[in-house]
Amino acid sequence: LIIIEAMIPFFVSFEGRKPKVRDIVILAVMCALGGTGRAAFFMLPNFSPTMAIVIISGVAFGCEGGFVVGAMSMFVSNFLMGQGPWTPWQMFAMGLVGFMAGLFFSKSGVRTKNTTKLGLCIFGALICILIYGGIMNPASVIIWQPAVNRSMIIASYVTGFPFDVVHGTATVIFLWLLARPFLEKLDRVRIKYGVL
């Protein structure tokens, strides 16, 4: 319940911007890409383009847009992967990834020229392991254990680290391949149609 309540300010902030239909449509497309990207790679645990798409969305559309794409991508993809008590945690963690991408990289009108592929890849790997893994690893203990202690939390970080590395590697690969073409197209759409 606390995680769900923690997401409310982000969604209220987005709604406070009074988004137009065209803003919502482009964010919905990015959410659909994130959700289907996760479903398309379901046979490879933790290897999907979802985090890369969320980071790209945060860079292209700012903090609030990145949060919305991250949170909704996890919500939508969990209709295929399975909804459960982990869904709000995943939504919050991935939304935070999109928010932080917007915070670190969206400083100018044309964001493509100021964002390097290498910088995005390093950011993607670190945020995947430190933020997403840092939230989801202990969440696996908090969700299922009635009495949580420090050794359980440490064990969740240790056992989750290899999966975080795989997830971070996938994020780096997909950012390396997709960041530049996606950001160029999204900047073009943003400038031409006045999106976000």
Regions found by a protein language model. Give the residues of each.
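Membrane-embedded alpha-helical hairpins and interfacial helices in multi-pass inner-membrane proteins
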Residues: 1, 43, 48, 83-89, ...
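Membrane topogenic helices and adjacent juxtamembrane segments
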Residues: 1-30, 111-112
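Short, mixed-charge, low-aromatic patches
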Residues: 7-14, 53-58, 132-137
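Alpha-helical membrane segments and adjacent membrane-interface helices in multi-pass membrane proteins
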Residues: 30-105
